[in-house]
Amino acid sequence: MAPSTGSYLAGSRLFGLVLVCLLMAAATTTSGYRPDPVTGFPQQSIVVDSWPGDKKVAVCFVFYVEVWGFGHGPDFRPDMVKRKPDLVNEYYRQYGINEGIDRIGRLFARLDVPLSVALSALFPDQRPEIWKSFREIQPGASIIAHGMNNSTEQLPLAQGLKAQEVYVGKTLDLVEKSVGVRPKGWSSPSVYANVDTYTATAAEGIKYSLDAMDSDELSRLQTPSGSLLMIPYPVVTVDMGQNLARQQMPVMLEQLWTDYVMELVHEAEVDPDRPATVVAIGIHPFVSGTPSGAAALRRVLERIKEEKLVWLTDVDSIYDHALGQ
């Protein structure tokens, strides 16, 4: 039996009302999004009123445990790279691995400060004795996937989205096999990524990324494969760039890190209603893992541990707190 005119009109009105509600809901859901200037994906600020314990500044140190390979990696003396073999730069890198990794682990354990580790997936198999020793010192450190290695097996940026998905999946599988933990965070090798990287990491189950350098606050990046929590990782706070590219010695890094954190604390004190901030500070064994580097880092940690508004934490805890908001 055909519907009456009244029924048809009522149904049309109901459909129109439902459509309007859906459109309003969609507008509400996307409210606050803006295009990310690099990827073009929608990005939304995540406002955190405070961190656990009414803290206002979250600080996490990300320790890079990487595979470079013989003849690859950062150079302390660029004027000597043409030597064959280049003993000075090779031993500079090896010192960081042989001595610096455990030194950093001991420092954070002794001060009872959480540590996050950005791990090259090939490291545990290539240097098992060093990895075993470090994990005995730091059994609970958060593990962030940092690609296969940092030189010859970086992201296949020119090969398309699918190739990056395979690479990310392989990295996660290998880390899980070696460490027993499947990372939920990602930091691209040498911070060298492209628009496909964000989509690929989300597709492979990554929940947060350190490939974000443009804010003091958390944000959510909406990729075609799902969302990523973007944790601020300012380029100016990374020890390697400051040390090797700008010739900043550890005592200068000490001043930089202290000033950076304390200014965020000061801003929170003068404006208690402003959103809570976060900074992930990148450290490397051949810079911060030297005796002078560790001494400078120790003084920084001792100083900011005294601040009642600072939450010294790890990246997994930042993600968990943001997720629970």
Segment roles from a protein language model:
Residues Q159-V166, Q248-M252, S292, A296:
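Alpha-helix N-cap and loop-to-helix initiation/capping positions
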Residues R83-P85, D102-G105, R110-N194, G226-S227, ...:
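Metal-dependent polysaccharide deacetylase catalytic core of the NodB/CE4 family, i.e.
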Residues G40-I46, R110-D112, Q138, Y208, ...:
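C-terminal domain-boundary segment and adjacent tail
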Residues Y33-G53, D173-K177, V181-R274:
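Active-site-adjacent pocket scaffolds in enzyme catalytic domains
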Residues I97, I101, R127, Q164, ...:
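Aromatic/hydrophobic pocket-lining residues that form the small-molecule binding cavity
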